[in-house]
């Protein structure tokens, strides 16, 4: 059963992200570059947060279990804040690059729209986040058939796969909403992204029940997805045309700057 569990959980966690990459990004080299750059920014944010957390552990040098738990929570909160700071830094970089391309040839619109860049960068953040959070767990599913934690839920791998999926998709939605907030100077939008990110990342410290955490995370994902859909220019009419395959110029395939 270990091999079916491995492939099943892998497809659950990374299947939708791979499909998005294959159909919306892989055909355009420029989008692939922006995706890799977004993944790199997330990696750097992880490196910095790991360094800070390691330094705090060395400085405190306390082996008390309760103190270690507080340090773990502190590390998670710090990591989320640094990730959002790097999302902001990546937006600033993309904005400068877009303005530079427009200044080179102002008569021809060669720069991708910021909404498209928000989607691509968010997917880059999400894929790299999912890989680092789930690959070790996924490798354990190959054998000897246990996660190594006595009394843990038998649905541990399945729950982890669905949680990885929701985090990847949330990064996509967070990216779209975050960039829109930066474009329109709506700082409450950035705060909302930060707070929802904190809730999803720290809810496991508040509740030991996987089902509760998954339901909460998926509710947040649906709400953020609806928000991202509308700020990206979507509407009920465009959604209807898309589902009926009648819209030839739908959202991310529209190359015009909005």
From Swiss-Prot:
<keyword id="KW-0472">Membrane</keyword>
<comment type="subunit">
    <text>Potential component of the gamma-secretase complex.</text>
</comment>
<dbReference type="GO" id="GO:0060134">
    <property type="term" value="P:prepulse inhibition"/>
</dbReference>
<comment type="function">
    <text>Potential subunit of the gamma-secretase complex, an endoprotease complex that catalyzes the intramembrane cleavage of integral proteins such as Notch receptors and APP (amyloid-beta precursor protein).</text>
</comment>
<dbReference type="GO" id="GO:0035249">
    <property type="term" value="P:synaptic transmission, glutamatergic"/>
</dbReference>
<feature type="transmembrane region" description="Helical; Name=4">
    <location>
        <begin position="116"/>
        <end position="136"/>
    </location>
</feature>
<dbReference type="GO" id="GO:0007219">
    <property type="term" value="P:Notch signaling pathway"/>
</dbReference>
<feature type="transmembrane region" description="Helical; Name=5">
    <location>
        <begin position="161"/>
        <end position="181"/>
    </location>
</feature>
<dbReference type="GO" id="GO:0016485">
    <property type="term" value="P:protein processing"/>
</dbReference>
<protein>
    <recommendedName>
        <fullName>Putative gamma-secretase subunit APH-1C</fullName>
    </recommendedName>
</protein>
<dbReference type="GO" id="GO:0070765">
    <property type="term" value="C:gamma-secretase complex"/>
</dbReference>
<dbReference type="InterPro" id="IPR009294">
    <property type="entry name" value="Aph-1"/>
</dbReference>
<dbReference type="GO" id="GO:0045202">
    <property type="term" value="C:synapse"/>
</dbReference>
<keyword id="KW-1133">Transmembrane helix</keyword>
<keyword id="KW-0812">Transmembrane</keyword>
<feature type="transmembrane region" description="Helical; Name=1">
    <location>
        <begin position="5"/>
        <end position="25"/>
    </location>
</feature>
<feature type="transmembrane region" description="Helical; Name=2">
    <location>
        <begin position="32"/>
        <end position="52"/>
    </location>
</feature>
<comment type="similarity">
    <text>Belongs to the APH-1 family.</text>
</comment>
<dbReference type="Pfam" id="PF06105">
    <property type="entry name" value="Aph-1"/>
</dbReference>
<feature type="transmembrane region" description="Helical; Name=7">
    <location>
        <begin position="214"/>
        <end position="234"/>
    </location>
</feature>
<dbReference type="GO" id="GO:0001963">
    <property type="term" value="P:synaptic transmission, dopaminergic"/>
</dbReference>
<dbReference type="GO" id="GO:0016020">
    <property type="term" value="C:membrane"/>
</dbReference>
<dbReference type="GO" id="GO:0001656">
    <property type="term" value="P:metanephros development"/>
</dbReference>
<dbReference type="GO" id="GO:0007614">
    <property type="term" value="P:short-term memory"/>
</dbReference>
<feature type="transmembrane region" description="Helical; Name=6">
    <location>
        <begin position="187"/>
        <end position="207"/>
    </location>
</feature>
<dbReference type="GO" id="GO:0006509">
    <property type="term" value="P:membrane protein ectodomain proteolysis"/>
</dbReference>
<feature type="transmembrane region" description="Helical; Name=3">
    <location>
        <begin position="71"/>
        <end position="91"/>
    </location>
</feature>
<dbReference type="GO" id="GO:0005886">
    <property type="term" value="C:plasma membrane"/>
</dbReference>
<keyword id="KW-0914">Notch signaling pathway</keyword>
């Amino acid at each position: 059963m270990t091999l079916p569990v491995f492939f099943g959980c892998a497809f659950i966690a990374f299947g939708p992200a791979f499909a998005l990459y294959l159909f919306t990004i892989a055909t355009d080299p420029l989008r692939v570059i922006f995706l890799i750059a977004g993944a790199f920014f997330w990696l750097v944010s992880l490196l910095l947060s790991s360094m800070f957390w390691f330094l705090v552990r060395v400085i405190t040098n306390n082996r008390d279990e309760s103190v270690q738990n507080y340090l773990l929570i502190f590390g998670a909160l710090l990591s989320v804040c640094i990730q959002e700071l790097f999302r902001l830094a990546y937006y600033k970089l993309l904005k400068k690059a877009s303005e530079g391309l427009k200044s080179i040839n102002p008569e021809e619109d060669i720069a991708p729209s910021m909404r498209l860049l928000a989607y691509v960068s968010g997917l880059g953040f999400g894929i790299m986040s999912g890989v680092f959070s789930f690959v070790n767990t996924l490798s354990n599913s190959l054998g000897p058939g246990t996660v190594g934690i006595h009394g843990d839920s038998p649905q541990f791998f399945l729950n982890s796969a669905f949680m990885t999926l929701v985090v990847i998709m949330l990064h996509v939605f967070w990216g779209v909403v975050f960039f829109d907030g930066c474009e329109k100077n709506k700082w409450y939008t950035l705060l909302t992204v930060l707070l929802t990110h904190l809730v999803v990342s720290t809810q496991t410290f508040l509740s030991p029940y996987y089902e509760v955490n998954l339901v909460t995370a998926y509710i947040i994902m649906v709400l953020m997805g609806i928000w991202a859909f509308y700020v990206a220019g979507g509407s009920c009419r465009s959604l209807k045309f898309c589902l009926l395959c009648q819209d030839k110029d739908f959202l991310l395939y529209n190359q015009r700057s909005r």
